[in-house]
Design a protein with these regions (language model features):
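Amphipathic alpha-helical packing segments from all-alpha helical-bundle domains
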Residues: 105-118, 122-152
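Hydrophobic/aromatic-rich alpha-helical bundle segments in the mid-to-C-terminal region
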Residues: 129-133, 137, 147-198
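Hydrophobic alpha-helical connector segments
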Residues: 56, 69-107, 164-165
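Helix-turn-helix
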Residues: 10, 14, 18-60
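Alpha-helix N-cap and coil->helix boundary residues
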Residues: 27-28, 109-113, 159-163, 188
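Hydrophobic/aromatic residues within well-ordered alpha-helical segments
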Residues: 50, 57, 61, 65, ...
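N-terminal intrinsically disordered/low-complexity leader segments
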Residues: 1-6, 76-77
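Short amphipathic alpha-helical interface segments enriched in basic and hydrophobic/aromatic residues
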Residues: 16, 20, 24, 62, ...
Length: 207
């Protein structure tokens, strides 16, 4: 990476950190330049304005999400995707969910991007759409697909798959948000999530 490319990435990293704490509107170009250790005028040689920085951050965030999120890559009609889920057990479901949660909470880029989206979703329509897609639409689609798949295989009772998916995944979102606000409660939330998933499989186990 060239020096200019390195500085550009440093600006993006600093912007993500500041935007995730104090929001886009409250962060000035001067603060961004100071965080990187460059002059304000120098920053404009990398980005036209603050909006251009935000646009670049959103694009990078979307690319990382598409690459790493289990929800974005789900294809329940693809045998290659469903192969390792054919004999899904409560233990497997717990590990699947907790693995994704740990990634979301502890990957610095993803964690900061989520907080930035939470702050900015009420001021930026594009961010609101991204927040809805990432935290609701894709999650519900993934778990509805999982439930339908397990019902077809005779592992879960045949009920309303969308409501079953909501019962499974939406409480987990509440605990995930709790961890964002109070990181010290992650162990507590993890225990509750595990109990919740196991109870779901007990309640809906095919008779």
């Amino acid at each position: 990476m060239t020096a200019k490319g390195s500085t550009k990435q440093e600006i993006l990293d600093a912007a993500l950190e500041l935007f995730s704490v104090q929001g886009y509107e409250a962060t000035s170009i001067s603060q961004l330049a100071e965080a990187v250790g460059i002059r304000k005028a120098s920053l404009y040689s990398h980005f036209e304005n603050k909006q251009a920085i935000l646009d670049a951050l959103m694009q990078a965030t979307l690319e990382q999400y598409e690459q790493h999120s289990i929800f974005a890559k789900a294809d329940w009609d693809d045998p290659a995707f469903t192969k390792d889920k054919e004999n899904m057990t409560p233990d497997m479901a717990v590990q699947l969910c907790l693995g994704q949660i740990r990634y979301i909470l502890h990957d610095p880029q993803i964690s900061r991007a989520r907080k930035m989206l939470t702050i900015e979703q009420f001021r930026n329509r594009q961010m609101a759409s991204m927040q809805t897609k990432r935290n609701y639409t894709d999650v519900m689609s993934y778990f509805t697909g999982l439930v339908r798949f397990l019902v077809r295989r005779g592992q879960l009772a045949d009920s309303d798959p969308e409501i079953m998916a909501a019962q499974l995944c939406l409480p987990v979102s509440v605990w995930l948000n709790l961890c964002d606000r109070e990181p010290e409660r992650e162990a507590e939330a993890t225990r509750l999530i595990e109990r919740h998933i196991r109870q779901f499989f007990d309640v809906y186990r095919a008779k």
